[in-house]
């Protein structure tokens, strides 16, 4: 059995009404080192129920790569800056991936914790 250390990261999925707002949020997160990288996908169609009506809107989606534990700070920041009353913010924790990328994200965001990853070889 091989035991390898892997940096912990989180992926934060978030939407914004425009590419301009998404870019402003992404820039602030990367500049403050709350995020190592943010991908922005524009012109995504969203259908949702709001106050009893089905709405359809175009949105930009952000996929934010951050260090473990920083998603709470990201959520706090975004809730203050976002134009939506109830912004979509979802956190995912990858269990596998490129160890070098995980370490890069941890380094950029100043996260030093690692986890043990036990694998059968």
Question: PLM features: residue spans?
Answer:
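Positively charged, small/polar-rich N-terminal and surface patches that mediate targeting and assembly
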Residues: 1-121
């Amino acid at each position: 059995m091989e035991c390898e250390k892997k940096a912990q990261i989180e992926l934060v999925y978030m939407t914004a009404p425009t590419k301009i707002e998404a870019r402003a949020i992404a820039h602030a997160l990367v500049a403050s080192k709350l995020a190592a990288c943010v991908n922005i996908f524009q012109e995504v169609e969203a259908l949702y129920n709001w106050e009893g009506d089905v709405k359809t809107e175009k949105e930009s989606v952000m996929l934010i790569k951050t260090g473990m534990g920083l998603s709470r700070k990201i959520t706090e920041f975004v809730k203050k800056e976002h134009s939506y009353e109830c912004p979509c913010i979802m956190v995912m924790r990858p269990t596998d991936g490129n160890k070098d990328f995980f370490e890069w994200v941890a380094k950029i965001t100043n996260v030093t914790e690692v986890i043990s990853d036990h694998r059968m070889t």
